[in-house]
C-alpha cells in the first residue's frame, strides 16, 4: 500500500531537499527519474530501486518492527553506537580513506 513520490515538479517546484537523501540512497538514474517525472512509485519499485529494504503487509508491520527493535536492542549498545557512527562517517570519505578509517574503528 505504501507509495513514494517527489511531486514538486508537478506543481512547478523542484524537490531539492528530498533530492539530497534520495540521491544518496538510489542510483542517479532512479533519483532523476523520480525527481523529473514526479510520478508515484509503489513499494515493489521502491524496493527494486533500493529505497526500501523490505515490504511488509500492513497487518504484520508492528510485529516486524518490534522484532527488529528487539533484535537490535539485544546487541551491545556500544557496538551499535560505534557501528552507526562509523557507517555514516565512512560514507562521506574517499574509498581509501574509508578503509583506513574503518580499520581503526
Enumerate the predicted regions with their spans.
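Acidic, divalent-metal-coordinating active-site segment for phosphoryl/phosphodiester hydrolysis
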Residues: 38-45
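Structured beta->alpha junctions
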Residues: 35-38, 72
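Short loop/turn segments at beta->alpha junctions
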Residues: 27, 42, 57-60
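Generic anion/oxyanion-binding catalytic loop in active/binding sites
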Residues: 11, 20, 35-36, 54, ...
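C-terminal long alpha-helix characteristic of the crotonase
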Residues: 2, 52-104
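Terminal peptide-recognition signature
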Residues: 22, 46, 83
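CoA-thioester-processing core
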Residues: 1-34, 49, 64, 68
Amino acid at each position: 500500500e505504501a507509495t513514494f513520490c517527489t511531486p514538486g515538479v508537478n506543481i512547478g517546484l523542484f524537490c531539492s531537499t528530498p533530492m539530497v537523501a534520495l540521491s544518496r540512497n538510489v542510483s542517479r538514474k532512479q533519483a532523476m527519474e523520480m525527481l523529473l517525472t514526479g510520478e508515484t512509485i509503489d513499494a515493489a519499485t521502491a524496493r527494486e530501486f533500493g529505497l526500501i529494504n523490505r515490504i511488509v503487509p500492513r497487518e504484520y508491520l508492528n510485529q516486524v518492527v518490534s522484532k527488529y527493535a528487539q533484535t537490535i536492542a539485544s546487541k551491545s549498545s556500544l557496538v551499535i553506537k560505534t557501528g552507526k557512527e562509523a557507517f555514516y562517517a565512512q560514507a562521506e570519505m574517499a574509498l581509501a580513506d574509508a578503509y583506513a578509517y574503518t580499520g581503526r574503528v
